[in-house]
């Protein structure tokens, strides 16, 4: 190799943080009838599942997790393409066509109570993969914070109201802490301090404003955190 450079070979590469990504995130392809079991069998401890019928483009995206759905049978679930709450989404129904299921590992054991923030949260976390699932009850107070059980600051955050109709609010480090984008919409980022209180996540908590979509008083929420 030229002076000041190294040869391109695996011995000269920095060891990856995650050597086998399929331990923490994987994808299943199967019939609609079998996609639930196929997806939940992926990764070491599948704790978050996202299912979509590949054969029918008008069908819903089905999301569920092991904090709210201990048995991982798809009930309760939410739909990423709608504002519906868990009651409206109802009982899981298998897709009719060949489907895809994305699975994320969310750690082992029961959810833990996290009191790092001003609002207590129930959390399943896989810090090795930088992923956690948090559920909490809003208090309507701007600047309220919620613990996420990860070792690094959250880079991408998805929050959904489980108890009321609301959009899927997302914060990403690339767009900053003053705006949100929405899974269920094709609109551009919307700036509003009521979303995140103009505050970026830390290595222990994320912060919410007063908007009903993430902090309505008495409403229940789920947050998916990616560090």
Model-predicted segments: where are they?
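Surface-exposed molecular-recognition determinants
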Residues: 1-227
């Amino acid at each position: 190799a030229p002076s000041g450079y190294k040869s391109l070979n695996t011995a000269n590469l920095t060891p990856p943080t995650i050597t086998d990504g399929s331990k923490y995130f994987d994808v299943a392809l199967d019939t609609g009838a079998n996609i639930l079991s196929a997806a939940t069998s992926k990764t070491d401890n599948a704790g978050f599942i996202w299912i979509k019928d590949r054969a029918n483009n008008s069908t819903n995206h089905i999301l569920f997790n092991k904090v709210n759905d201990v048995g991982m049978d798809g009930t309760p679930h939410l739909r990423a393409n709608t504002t519906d709450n868990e009651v409206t989404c109802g009982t899981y129904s298998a897709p009719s066509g060949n489907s895809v299921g994305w699975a994320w590992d969310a750690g082992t054991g029961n959810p833990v109570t996290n009191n790092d923030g001003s609002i207590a949260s129930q959390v399943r976390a896989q810090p090795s993969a930088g992923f956690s699932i948090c559920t909490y009850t809003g208090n309507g107070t701007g600047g309220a914070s919620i613990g996420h059980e990860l070792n690094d600051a959250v880079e991408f955050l998805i929050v959904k109201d489980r108890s009321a109709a609301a959009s899927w609010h997302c914060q990403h480090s690339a767009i900053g802490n003053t705006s949100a984008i929405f899974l269920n919409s094709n609109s551009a980022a919307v700036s509003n301090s009521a979303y995140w209180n103009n505050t970026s996540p830390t290595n222990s908590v994320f912060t919410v404003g007063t908007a009903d979509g993430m902090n309505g008083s008495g409403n229940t929420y789920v947050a998916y955190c990616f560090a």
